[in-house]
A protein has these predicted regions:
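Active-site- and interface-proximal helix/loop "cap" or "latch" segments in soluble metabolic
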Residues: 2-139
């Protein structure tokens, strides 16, 4: 039973939250935001403004330590910390790296390094056909 929410119905999330980081090419956080739309307790969302403490940190070795310093213990929320240290950091690296590589590989005739690194960048995908038609190959 969840007293704060008068129970949690089947199919309803116990945790429903999001995190958004605005980064530069050096992986420095310029803005950090979060929202807790559903949580086990009504006070869980009170800490989302604490994410501002991440502004100025860089997602690089030591990121997890910095996140824990800013948001660990009673200053934060375990699921939000986990999002930041796990999928958030990985997604940031993939996004920034891909953008940097696209700019570097914009040289005519050079195959972009991201081709065939995932489903979206498969050499026979519509994305490759649109962005790098010279390197598109029919399946």
């Amino acid at each position: 039973d969840n007293v704060d929410r008068d129970g949690v119905a089947a199919g309803d999330p116990v945790h429903h939250m999001w995190v958004r980081l605005t980064l530069d090419d050096e992986m420095v956080v310029h803005k950090a935001e979060a929202s807790t739309d559903a949580s086990p307790y009504s006070i869980c969302g009170d800490i989302v403004s604490s994410l501002e403490a991440l502004e100025g940190l860089a997602i690089m070795p030591g990121w997890r330590r910095g996140v824990i310093k800013c948001l660990g213990g009673t200053k934060g929320c375990t699921p939000i910390t986990d999002l930041l240290c796990g999928p958030g950091a990985v997604t940031a690296h993939q996004t920034i790296f891909a953008a940097k590589e696209r700019r570097k590989s914009a040289k005519p005739g050079k195959k972009p390094p991201q081709i065939n690194t995932c489903h979206a960048y498969a050499q026979n995908s519509d994305i490759v056909r649109r962005q790098w038609p010279d390197f598109y190959e029919e399946a």
